[in-house]
Amino acid sequence: MKLRAQFDRGTYSESKGSFKLRDSLDPMQPEPSSREGNGLSLTLQPELLARMPGAGSSSGTETGEDVRVPMGSSSGSTNGRGATSRRMRTASHSHSHTHGHGHSHEHESDSGESDLESGESSSSISELRYLLRWLKKSLPFIVILCAKLVIQHALGLAVAVGLFTTFMYVNKSIQTQVFLHDRRTNLHCAWLLLFLTSSSLLVFYTFHTQSLYRCLFFANATIDYHNFWEVLWSVGVTNFILKFIFMGFKCLILLVPCPLMTYRRRGQWYMLIEEVGQLYQVIAPVPLWFRYLVSYDEMDTSVGLTLGILLALLYLIMKLLALYGLSGSLQKTLRTFFSPEVNGAPASPAQIREAGDICPICQADFKQPRVLVCQHIFCEECIAQWLNQERTCPLCRTVITDKVHKWKDGATSAHLQIY
């Protein structure tokens, strides 16, 4: 009995050791071949089976073989769950595919637009670089060509610069003298008139062979009307001389003594002279350009003459439209010139004493004080001079008039009428 008990304890210890070793190696491993069926079978080791109740008799007969235990439900339930899981996977896959496809389409369109914009910007940059490279290579020739043109037309360019400089100087001087009002210098005004006259006569004398003075009276100058540059030259000189003539009229207005003409009336004369001068400058180049458009060489056919007449008629239509626009401005100027201009009402002595007896503009005693709608008092000449360029009160910015006559300050338009 002692020997049998020792033998049983030894056998139990060996089986326990082997069970621990098998347990570390995961005794319940599914067989790969069994995954192809509807169920799942596990392979149990003999040692694990020996510990199970009721397995004592079978353990002695099948000691060296594994036991397979099927796990899972019936084939119907297994197929149902498999189909359900497959449908869920298919639905989720289709949803993710659709969502991913929409996002991919948006990303593709955005990337296409960005690629197009980047391509356009790169092409424009490359064109700009090509242009700069071409200018860099052609710069020496451009300088040589400009030098040749300057030498060839040195006299004409010098006259053009002189006429423009004279115009800017006299125009600024006239505005300064108008602003000075009573403090203007008659000697300086006379000098401006003499300077304008001498400049005009010098130009006519220098180019006396072309008879440019005839263009002032819409007559034909002795120039080649087939040459575009000569016609353009005649138009430019005529325009500057006309500006000088009307600026001379403004100098004559400046020389009129103050008792004979008020400042407000002077401003109306300046405005009328400028409007008439601009209208005359629009009409003056018409004969020159008309003859240039209808002129033809002996080699030209009747088609060339017909085309020239058609172009001349189109030019006349354009000039008539321009004159129609200027006629409205001239009518407004004439109405302003012949209508009395009143700014405010005469101020009472009490209002003058309350204001302090000093004009806020000229900082001197009031001369013909006028009270505005805002109850501020100014000299009549001072407020008239202010309202030539502004519409509001100098102190409170209340709107006094809705008209601004910009030519009342003696300025002359710098626009060069070349057509």
From Swiss-Prot:
Function: E3 ubiquitin-protein ligase that acts in the endoplasmic reticulum (ER)-associated degradation (ERAD) pathway, which targets misfolded proteins that accumulate in the endoplasmic reticulum (ER) for ubiquitination and subsequent proteasome-mediated degradation. Protects cells from ER stress-induced apoptosis.
EC number(s) on file: 2.3.2.27
Annotated catalysed reactions: S-ubiquitinyl-[E2 ubiquitin-conjugating enzyme]-L-cysteine + [acceptor protein]-L-lysine = [E2 ubiquitin-conjugating enzyme]-L-cysteine + N(6)-ubiquitinyl-[acceptor protein]-L-lysine
Membrane topology of the entry: Multi-pass membrane protein
Gene: rnft1
InterPro entries: RNFT1/2, Znf_RING, Znf_RING/FYVE/PHD, Znf_RING_CS
Ranges that cross the membrane: 141-161, 187-207, 217-237, 240-260, 270-290, 303-323
Protein name per UniProt: E3 ubiquitin-protein ligase RNFT1
Region (Required for ubiquitin ligase activity and for protection against ER stress-induced cell death): 352-403
Keywords: Endoplasmic reticulum, Membrane, Metal-binding, Transferase, Transmembrane, Transmembrane helix, Ubl conjugation pathway, Zinc, Zinc-finger
GO biological process, one term: protein ubiquitination
CC per GO annotation: endoplasmic reticulum; endoplasmic reticulum membrane
Ranges of biased composition (kind: Polar residues): 31-44, 72-82
Region (Disordered): 1-120
PANTHER family: E3 UBIQUITIN-PROTEIN LIGASE RNFT1, UNCHARACTERIZED RING FINGER-CONTAINING PROTEIN
GO molecular function, one term: zinc ion binding
Signal peptide: none
Metabolic or biological pathway, per its Swiss-Prot or TrEMBL entry: Protein modification; protein ubiquitination
Major location category of this protein: endoplasmic reticulum
Pfam families to which the protein is assigned, alphabetical: zf-RING_2
Zinc finger (RING-type): 359-397
Subcellular location(s) per record: Endoplasmic reticulum membrane
Biased segments, Basic residues type: 84-102
